[in-house]
């Protein structure tokens, strides 16, 4: 453990508190900080000691002479926020959900349904117990859950040919063929994850609820998409106040099987690593207006590629009418746009192409103030910090493989 030296930081406070032993207790506590606008720079959780909490605190006070401002995993925390350096590090925060999970708000459609709440706890337990490298447990969905899925699947599939982007429509039949996408069947995350890995290297990881923007985007840097496994309440199949398996599998998954879109999504994730908090908010806004609610030009048409649109029958129709305002996607302008969460978007941003958007995100990422650049090493599934000559040599060696590409092109000419 590292204790930072005495500094003059203002408004910084360290605190220790205990929680009841129940699923969702941490999420409840963190929600209080969020409601009061308090920024948490570091969180650690430990199993409760056998001694009373007061005794533990008294012991710490006796041993530590200076005021403790923050604890970090290493000295780099003094200058930049911590970020995962390898794919196993995702285990450290995957269960730090901010809302929902098995705990539902009073206005949630399933709040008064004890059967639904018990079912949500089953899904939450799967996510909480999952660790990288394990197979995602298979789930036997109930007939009621399949009926809800079937309603959403049937309605959306009728719109995809005329409203979804070409990349989505190209992949969707493949998901039906290889991953069990059917009106009467809810596909399994493990099957889909393996298929995505064979297409683009992306994989799914079960999550109990909403992660912070920083944690969620960090997963994308490793080509990991944190996916819910539960389904919306059956009383209103066409509405959900949170991401569910319909949103993940019908909206997100098809595009993660497209190489260009997969690279675009990873670029947003890489840009978030070590970024200051204010830039995380900006990147989250870019993500919202692209990966979630993006439109793109395809020939003379405008099509949807955002998962929030591709999983919402009503908004998918609305977005391609003359009711909303359409603007060209420019990250510097997009980050300034406010957006509603519980209603249709009044403004959408239109991309020229995934490649064009990827380059624009790269250029914007270069403006983020951080003392180094990063790259993802797909062989070791780790993040390389490019801050020394050896790392630059390694990068140069990988670039040298472009010669193989040039040679292949010459032989094909």
Where are these regions (language model features)?
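A conserved regulatory-domain signal marking ACT and ACT-like small-molecule sensing domains
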Residues: 1-96
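Intein-associated homing endonuclease modules of the LAGLIDADG/DOD-type, together
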Residues: 32, 144, 148, 292-294
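Extended, Lys/Arg-enriched charged tracts that mediate electrostatic binding to polyanionic substrates
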Residues: 193, 270, 274-306
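Beta-strand-enriched cores of mature, soluble protein domains
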Residues: 255-269, 273-274
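A recognition module on extended beta-rich or small alphabeta surfaces enriched in W/G with H and D/E
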Residues: 308-382
